[in-house]
Amino acid sequence: MAVQKSRVTPSRRGQRRSHDALTAKKLSIDPTSGEVHIRHHVTADGYYRGKKVIAIKASVVEED
């Protein structure tokens, strides 16, 4: 098993953990569809910056 050479100080531990913080995702509203989406990503409808860039197939819903 690995054994540390010396004890890690609280300052060192904090410096190591300083990059572990979680941030909220940046959201935008598409000007065409009004849909909320992540910045710099295509919406679920296939729009990006107000233009249709991907043709989305219609989802199939099975009815019982």
Curated annotation (Swiss-Prot):
This is Large ribosomal subunit protein bL32. One of its GO terms (molecular function) is structural constituent of ribosome. Belongs to the bacterial ribosomal protein bL32 family. GO terms for biological process: translation. SUPFAM superfamilies: Zn-binding ribosomal proteins (SSF57829). The keyword DNA-binding does not apply. It holds the Pfam family Ribosomal_L32p. Residues 1-28 are annotated as: Disordered. Keywords: Ribonucleoprotein, Ribosomal protein. One of its GO terms (cellular component) is large ribosomal subunit. The gene is rpmF. It comes from Xylella fastidiosa (strain 9a5c). InterPro entries: Ribosomal_bL32, Ribosomal_bL32_bact, Ribosomal_zn-bd. It comes from the Bacteria.
